[in-house]
Regions:
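Long, histidine/aromatic-enriched segments associated with O2/redox biology
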Residues: 34-331
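Short, positively charged and aromatic/hydrophobic N-terminal segments
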Residues: 21-22, 27, 33-34
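Ser/Thr-rich, low-complexity intrinsically disordered segments
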Residues: 1-13, 32
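A residue-level detector for conformationally permissive "hinge/kink" positions
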Residues: 10-11, 23, 268
Length: 331
């Protein structure tokens, strides 16, 4: 049913269950009038152009105090660009979120609670934590100070299970030298791919997959460029998809036309002798993300992603990233 708003009725900020969502009076094609609430996604999801990042993953010390923890972490700062130039994205283990705010939990979403055992002994580990705070901005000193403040604020309620700093490399390339995110939707289209729609539990929220992939750089750089391109399924200089890409190429194994579109915010991480890619993928449907992982591991049709022979997943967690209004409600 197509929806049109009634121009004679003014939108208002409703102090209603679910937070300060915008409530619109709407008229359907059948003439029926009803109210529809609109929620706001965390702006950090779409804050492109940031060069410095830190991912803080936390484990709750006392599960009986999970609501207190959620209140503290949600009050760290508004989940939008701050005056200090830091963007925040706050996410929760899906099962934890369901316990805290069941009415805002999308059905069927689960944590990365067990490893994925792929073909030829390939394994993607599940290292699920309880919560994530992802900070991004233009200057790492501000990110560093804010990260220290967050860890301090949560001390006594949660331990820091994983911390990773990352940074942009040659504008939009990862450490393989290839452009990362060529299939990303534009910012106009990204919300449709990343956010749960209005009218559903978790509206304006997103399912986030966070993985740390270590690169086998010496082996990778020993390959000729044309072989690297066949493994990726794209040309290296200009990221053009190969017309006759191999079935085990990375592009073929993660075809978004097959699994559904996601919004990626990947970034390089690490030191000179130990580095790789932080995979940061947002989706309105967890099945798009899990399907891609199964395909990469060779569980869809027996064909393993060739890129996984030159990269190694070290971590894996799913988080539900709720709307701004729902976070406010927890404070």
């Amino acid at each position: 049913m197509a929806i049109t708003t009634d121009p004679s009725i003014t939108s208002k900020s409703a102090n209603c269950r679910g937070g300060d969502a915008i409530e619109l009076s709407c008229i359907g094609e059948d003439g029926a009038r009803y109210n529809a609430r609109m929620y706001t996604p965390q702006a950090g999801i779409f804050a492109l152009g940031t060069s410095s990042h830190t991912y803080l993953e936390f484990d709750i010390l006392d599960v009986k105090k999970s609501k207190e923890f959620a209140s503290t972490i949600s009050a760290i700062r508004e989940p939008r660009t701050t005056t200090g130039g830091v963007n925040f994205v706050i996410g929760f283990r899906p099962e934890l979120w369901r316990d805290i705010v069941p009415e805002d939990a999308p059905p069927g979403v689960a944590g990365f609670n067990k490893e994925i055992q792929g073909k030829e002994g390939f394994v993607m580990p599940g290292t699920q934590h309880d919560a994530l705070v992802w900070l991004s901005g233009s200057a790492y000193d501000v990110i560093f100070d804010m990260a220290r403040s967050i860890v301090h604020d949560l001390a006594g309620q949660a331990s820091l299970g994983e911390e990773t700093a990352s940074w942009s490399y040659q504008h939009d390339r990862d450490l393989t030298g290839f452009v990362d995110g060529s299939e990303n939707p534009t910012l106009l289209d990204a919300p449709a791919a990343a956010l749960l729609p209005e009218g559903f539990p978790g509206a304006a929220g997103s399912v986030l997959l966070l993985q740390k992939w270590k690169h086998k750089t010496t082996e990778w750089e020993a390959l000729p460029i044309d072989q690297q391109e066949r493994i990726m399924g794209r040309t290296k200089p200009d990221s053009i998809e190969l017309e006759n890409k191999p079935a085990d190429s990375h592009v073929a194994r993660t075809d978004q036309d097959e699994f559904g579109h996601i919004f990626r915010r990947n970034m390089p991480y690490g030191r000179v002798d130990d580095h790789g890619t932080m995979f940061v993928g947002f989706s309105a449907d967890q099945k798009r993300l899990s399907g891609m992982l199964d395909s990469m591991a060779g569980l869809i049709n027996g064909t393993r992603d060739a890129l996984t022979r030159f990269t190694q997943p070290l971590t894996g967690s799913y988080y539900f990233v709720p709307s701004v209004e729902t976070l406010r409600r927890l404070r």
